[in-house]
Regions:
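Short loop/turn motifs that connect adjacent beta-strands in outer-membrane beta-barrel proteins
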Residues: 17-31, 70-77, 110-113, 143, ...
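Outer-membrane beta-barrel translocator domains and adjoining extracellular loop/strand segments
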Residues: 1, 43-51, 90-97, 128-135, ...
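Membrane-embedded beta-strand positions of outer-membrane beta-barrel proteins
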Residues: 32-36, 80-82, 116-118, 146-148, ...
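Transmembrane beta-barrel domains of Gram-negative outer membranes and organellar outer membranes
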Residues: 1-92
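Residues on the lipid-exposed face of transmembrane beta-strands in outer-membrane beta-barrel proteins
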Residues: 9-17, 62-70, 102-110, 120, ...
Length: 216
């Protein structure tokens, strides 16, 4: 049995980026997100019979994410992003502790309410490198949004607005997990560890109504 508890914190800054370009019809800002994550591991029980790897008590994520979601034409757009970070328990920092992730998704506006999506998500894990990204987004009105989308489906509803922020509630799915490096006790060298799962989450989020400033 393996248990993990996670704590993640991040803040998103929206910066002007090609605002006057004809390839950015929606004036999409460049989104910069520095973040930090902590994982608290419990298990698995290591015995001579199972030969499981003994995991560290803690691992950490330190990353910066950039994203840009331009609308190139009234029909075609994109969702682009790159994340670079260090994923380790800090016992020993090696080249494998660095990970580069990204996503490149093309969008097609079928109707004012429906948008089709297809692309790839690069995870840079030891076992799973790439995932296909395919699905559609349905926005029936200004107060609801449905992402029927692999690997991150989501349904969200806008409840109210507080100052310059819209308050949304959501239910979402996610292909979760990650990859870390650590120095295993009694083992010379660095161990690379993958953890993969499927997650369901409920929550609220506050989204700035304006396109600039601190968002997270």
């Amino acid at each position: 049995q393996l248990d993990v508890n996670e704590l993640d914190t991040s803040a998103t800054f929206a910066l002007p980026f090609f605002f006057n370009s004809p390839a950015n019809l929606n004036r999409a800002p460049l989104l910069i997100t520095p973040g930090f994550g902590l994982q608290l591991w419990d298990g698995p029980q290591t015995t001579a019979a199972n030969n499981f790897v003994e995991l560290p008590a803690n691992t950490y994520d330190v990353f910066i994410d950039t994203a840009w979601n331009p609308q190139f034409t009234p029909l075609f757009g994109a969702e682009l992003g790159i994340r670079v970070g260090i994923y380790t328990n800090w016992d020993e920092l090696v080249w494998q502790s660095w990970r580069l992730m990204g996503r490149a998704i093309g969008t097609l506006n079928l109707t004012p309410q429906w948008q089709a999506k297809v692309g790839i998500v690069y995870l840079d894990r030891n076992q799973v490198k790439l995932l296909p990204a395919v699905g559609a987004t349905w926005v029936p009105n200004a107060n609801s949004r449905y992402d029927i989308f692999f690997p991150a489906p989501k349904a969200a509803w806008r409840f109210t607005q507080w100052r310059n922020r819209a308050v949304w509630g959501f239910i979402a799915g996610e292909y979760g997990g990650g990859a870390w490096t650590f120095n295993q006790s009694g083992n010379a060298g660095v161990t690379e560890f993958d953890y993969n799962d499927v997650r369901i989450s409920l929550g609220t989020e506050m989204v700035p109504v304006t396109a600039r400033g601190l968002a997270g």
